[in-house]
Amino acid sequence: IEIGSDFNKYRLLLLEHRPQQPLGPPFDPNIHQLNAKNAFWLIAKGPDGAVIHTQAMRVLDLKSFSLADHLRESFRGFTPVGPDIDLAASRYRAGPGAQKICGTVCYHGELWMDDRLGAYRGSGLSAVLGRFAFLICVKQLSPDYVFGFVARPVIFKGLAERLGYMHSEPASIRWRLHNKDRALEGFMVWMARDDLQFMMTIPLVDLVA
């Protein structure tokens, strides 16, 4: 496992090991001022040194307004990389959780596991690495809340629960695609500080068994 806060280095790692999914806008150092005080990335490597897993977190300063207010204005800054998104036709819907989330808020993204490595799927690795990232987040960034977006097909497979997320808001984000009838639907998942503290007391085996 390697952890860092130099997102230019992280970008280069992705170009080498995850070229099909380059760095997304929320963690682009050309857009945001990212450093050890407000962000970190985490990668895991296999026995051959290849990157098999990524995730990252960064702080949003929402002391003056709610996450719902922020995302109504800025949800397009969380556009997924790859699909041909029609930003004008896309939308964000604030749920009751987002309307009360404020303060020091961490966005959790860049979550990826190499599809080619079937040996790691079903092993509980995502839960282990997710727990580790939350621990770093609590110690390094001390958030009041953590949130992220999960694609609907992925959340139906239970990823958010394996990571330990205790709240989810369905139909929170919809990315329309150019020249296609279907849209990419996403849930917003989140935890408050007390949720994080409680989750850390749960034996890991109870999340991955």
Segment roles from a protein language model:
Residues 63-64, 69, 120, 199-203:
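Generic alpha-helix signal with a bias toward terminal, lower-confidence helices
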